[in-house]
From Swiss-Prot:
The keyword Ion transport does not apply. It is a multi-pass membrane protein. The gene is CHS7. One of its GO terms (cellular component) is endoplasmic reticulum membrane. GO terms for molecular function: unfolded protein binding. GO terms for biological process: cell wall organization; protein folding; protein transport. The chain crosses the membrane at residues 51-71, 83-103, 111-131, 157-177, 183-203, 223-243, 248-268. Belongs to the CHS7 family. InterPro entries: Chs7. Its main location: endoplasmic reticulum. Interacts with CHS3. It is found in: Endoplasmic reticulum membrane. This is Chitin synthase export chaperone. It holds the Pfam family Chs7.
């Protein structure tokens, strides 16, 4: 396989863009077919492609919705708005992948190249969004501000447009690109995204090692990288083996989708582990944060209340209260 060519990758993995790249055959058709792919199923006179993978996409949407709800509940957490944008983009990517994998927009349909280009655009936007999220923890600028949020959104939008445009130009043979000239597509979809992910991981390791006493977040990073790499290895190396072993009921795309979901969940766990809420602002949202564990005996309570009979405020529970910062309170 030469650099920038999809022939080897597409013969092993049933990814949507493979139907749109490659040299044209004598019949004028283009596309690279995988050596083995999951069988179709018929439901209510409708042919559905990649049934197992479609179910996993739906599970991913449900899990992403749950993660978004949990993030939104942490009103004062650092980087809350930024990480929510990441999950929204992942949800949009999952929906687009579901449309392509299930055959709602089947190969050969006029809209298929556009959906495939949008899918590539969302993939690049997701990686860029994650990269920019990686800078939030370093406090180079205040999180949640217009600068932080719009820097994230515009960067993600820019990569979405670049990746989507390069994909569409390649699929449609526009602007000097063609399905047989896929170096630009390969660089944008694979190389740049890999660089974004690598830089993000390195930055988070530096952040945890230099600023946190707790080392547990490193395990979240490790598991996230592990799941992502395993998913890619299964998709591009063992997809055909799995497909033939289970009689075409599923292929590597199912496991890649599952592993990508697990990697995203580890990103959520990592963010949650390094983010703390301000109790002063969140106490009103969590009922019964404080409770009386044990009442004082009657004799002790009376001694406390009437400790100083010369003052009508002697029984105050705030008498000689210790400050949380180590000094004496003025009260």
């Amino acid at each position: 396989m030469s650099f920038g060519q999809f022939d080897s990758l597409c013969r092993k993995a049933a990814i949507p863009l493979c139907s749109l790249v490659g040299s044209s055959s004598l019949s004028g058709t283009k596309g690279i077919l995988p050596s083995c792919y999951a069988r179709n199923i018929e439901v209510a006179n409708t042919i559905i492609f990649q049934g197992a993978t479609d179910v996993m996409h739906i599970v991913a949407l449900a899990m992403t919705a749950i993660m978004i709800i949990h993030v939104r509940s942490k009103f004062t957490a650092v980087g809350r708005k930024e990480i929510i944008t990441f999950f929204y983009i992942y949800m949009a990517l999952t929906i687009c992948s579901l449309v392509l994998d299930s055959g709602v927009a089947p190969p050969g349909n006029a809209v298929f190249p556009f959906f495939a280009a949008v899918q590539n655009g969302f993939a690049s936007a997701l990686c860029t969004c994650l990269l920019v999220n990686g800078f939030v923890g370093f406090q180079l600028y205040e999180d949640g501000t217009a600068l932080s949020v719009w820097l994230l959104r515009l960067s993600s939008l820019g990569m979405f447009l670049i990746s989507g445009a390069v994909s569409l130009l390649t699929f449609k043979s526009w602007a000097g690109l063609s399905p047989s000239n896929t170096i630009g597509l390969f660089v944008v979809v694979y190389i740049l995204n890999a660089i974004c992910l690598f830089v993000y991981v390195v930055m988070q390791i530096i952040l945890v090692v230099n600023t946190l006493q707790d080392r547990w977040p490193l395990w979240h990073i490790t598991f996230g990288v592990f799941f992502f790499i395993i998913g890619q290895v299964i998709l591009y190396s063992f997809s055909a083996v799995i497909c033939e072993s289970v009689q075409h009921y599923l292929d590597g795309l199912f496991f890649a989708t599952l592993c990508n979901l697990l990697a995203v969940m580890m990103i959520y766990k990592y963010w949650d582990s390094i983010t703390k809420e301000d109790l002063e602002f969140s106490v009103g949202l969590k009922q019964n944060n404080w409770e009386v564990k044990e009442l004082l005996p009657e004799e002790e309570r009376r001694a406390t209340v009437y400790l100083d009979t010369n003052s009508e405020y002697a029984g105050s529970v705030y008498h000689h209260r210790s400050s949380t910062y180590g000094g004496q309170s003025n009260y």
